[in-house]
Structures are given as structure tokens and as C-alpha cells.
Regions:
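N-terminal glycine/threonine-rich, aromatic-flanked beta-hairpin/loop signature
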Residues: 46-84
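Short, solvent-exposed coil/turn segments at beta-strand boundaries
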Residues: 57-64, 90-93, 119-130
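Positively charged n-region of N-terminal signal peptides that target proteins for export
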Residues: 1-4
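C-terminal motif of bacterial Sec signal peptides marking the signal peptidase cleavage site
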Residues: 15-16
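Edge beta-strand at a domain terminus
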Residues: 25-29, 36, 79-95, 126-148
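Flexible, membrane-facing loop/turn or short amphipathic-helix motifs
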Residues: 36-46, 71-78, 105-112, 133, ...
Length: 148
């Protein structure tokens, strides 16, 4: 019941975002990776297919993660564009690994402090992207294939 309530709250929180809101402004793309994949919310079994995600290496230490038209629950009335900024990363050849904790995500250019991103970890290889994290107390897993 608590998990259903969490998803309803998430849906209500993000319902204020316009369906036709402009995509978030992406910082200068020194190096960027875009993937198309699936977001899974393990606690409910909800999946969002064909989710476009972009990771931009902002500088030598930080990257930003952009998720476009994302939903976290079937009851969520609209999709949102979301940004997780200033994520520390390490690049070793073609492998990029990143991690973070206590990062406030933005949706519709507004901070959502109630859904702080915790236990963020991910990787980008030559052909795939993986992201695992919690939004508040809701775990999520994203797996995608890099666009060539």
C-alpha cells in the first residue's frame, strides 16, 4: 500500500508539469552519449519502454543525466523531462562509470527535493548505458542501447 501511495504522490507531484513543456536546456556538449532503453521500477513492476536518456560530460569530473518523457507509474498522468546534475564520474578508455548520492533532481526546471536521488551508480560502455538509483525511497533501474 505504501508503494502505491508513493506512486500516486509521484504522479501528483509531476502532474503539474506540462505535457508540452520544452526539453530541459542541455549544457554545452563536450561529450555526450544518448541511449534508448527501459526504465524498471522493481517495487511495482512498472516499466517505461523506449525511454530516451542522454548523459553529457560537463567537464573532467562531472556529468549530467537527462531523461526525456519519463514516467514512474502507470497512474502518472503525464510524462516529464528530468535532469540529474553534477554527477561525479570516472572515464577509463571507453568505459565511463558514475556515482552519486543526495542529488536533487529537476523536472520542469523545478527542484524536487522530496525525491532526492540516492545510491546512484551507472556506466556507459561502447554500446550500452546502465543507471541504478532511488528517487526518494523508490528504486529504479535503467538499461539502454547507445544510439550510434
Amino acid at each position: 500500500m505504501k508503494k502505491i501511495f508513493t506512486f500516486i504522490v509521484l504522479a501528483g507531484l509531476f502532474a503539474s508539469c506540462s505535457i508540452n513543456s520544452p526539453e530541459p536546456e542541455i549544457k554545452d556538449e563536450t561529450e555526450a552519449y544518448e541511449a534508448l532503453g527501459t526504465l524498471l521500477i522493481p517495487s511495482s513492476g512498472f516499466t517505461k519502454e523506449n525511454l530516451r536518456t542522454k548523459v553529457v560530460l560537463v567537464d573532467q569530473e562531472k556529468l549530467d543525466i537527462y531523461m526525456f518523457e519519463v514516467k514512474f507509474a502507470a497512474l502518472m498522468p503525464v510524462t516529464i523531462d528530468m535532469v540529474i546534475s553534477d554527477v561525479p564520474y570516472v572515464k577509463n578508455g571507453s568505459l565511463i562509470t558514475f556515482y552519486g548520492d543526495s542529488i536533487v533532481p529537476y523536472a520542469g526546471n523545478k527542484p524536487y527535493e522530496k525525491y532526492i536521488v540516492t545510491e546512484l551508480e551507472g556506466s556507459i560502455t561502447a554500446d550500452s548505458m546502465f543507471i541504478s538509483n532511488n528517487y526518494g525511497d523508490t528504486p529504479s533501474i535503467y538499461r539502454g542501447a547507445l544510439k550510434q
